[in-house]
């Protein structure tokens, strides 16, 4: 069966313009306009998705099948083009019968054209085929538009679902444009409203605990690099290519109706020299219905500017991924559990903003892993937030899992973060020795987020930095009073 892409090629129908018009109509829809006004950071993320939309639409048009009736009519038209005028006259009754049987839009016009002329001349033969082709072009264009409209509705539905999800999570997870872009990419998964409301809930809890958010910001950016620009920078010539519309079109892009004499198709010019069709030619010229070539072009010019040469001395400090271990023992339940989950959500926010990875491991008797910054980060975050802290404490297994993870090349500059009340047994000597080796030889940093003031000093001594967030009632009341 004939594909739509083949039909467009045969009839010189350009689908590019229709795809662009559909994309522009989608971007101008009221839903997207309101969304962009409310969440300006996500506008760039959605705009960056446009090439993927275009490719999906082109693929849909390329793979679409032409209806059997239209396929049969196109094949008949192609065969008719090969016939001479006497041969065409012999085949004309069968052609008219075929058009009538297929309910072709051209059937009535073809019948009228033959009945109104007693003699079927070569000029009439040319006109018959020309109008038949025009009818096929209209049918092909209509088919393209119908498919694009179906795709537009589906695409708009998908975009609205992603906009709803991204709009709900943007205040919690999108700190800058980079985070907004990654959040938009994550929203492509199949999620229901009830699922991501858990992230919204912990986002609201995090907003009510600004000290927790501030702690995550300090920990996440404690290794930020510093750059010092040099003074008296010399000027350098900078050349760029600037695209400008060409004054002289240079490429055939299809066929259109118009009155441009210089771009007429040869069959149209042929009718001008036939006495019987001369008035028909002028009528179509006045009504701008003559078939003409559609041309376009572009030009590039070199723009020369000068700018200072900027050299910077950078104090290189790695800002690698987070490996976060969360204690899920019974002593970490209640308010501690809420704080631990909200703190991980805050680290996820920092990771998205700085284009870093955020890997979560839960430790009690077993180790459960989640990656919050991957393509399925939102689903992983929901699963993590759905966990209940009711196990025991095996902090040694947590450290062994961290050490094993840091052996991989992609984690060579990772920071380890352990969230616990640190009320546990002492660490084995081999674990302490291995952690010290990672700190000395590979510059890995180990952070402790202590949720209690009663953590064992023997355990916490191995950490590079201890971030304290006491969840006791007295500390909670003091924090609220200071606000």
Swiss-Prot record:
Pfam families: VWA_CoxE. Keywords: Chaperone, Cytoplasm. The keyword Cytoplasm applies. CDD domains: VWA_YIEM_type. It is found in: Cytoplasm. One of its GO terms (cellular component) is cytosol. The keyword Cytoplasm applies. SUPFAM superfamilies: vWA-like (SSF53300). InterPro entries: Uncharacterised_CoxE, Uncharacterised_ViaA, VWF_A, vWFA_dom_sf. Its main location: cytoplasm. Homodimer. Interacts with RavA. Component of the RavA-ViaA chaperone complex, which may act on the membrane to optimize the function of some of the respiratory chains. ViaA stimulates the ATPase activity of RavA. Belongs to the ViaA family. This is Regulatory protein ViaA. The gene is viaA.
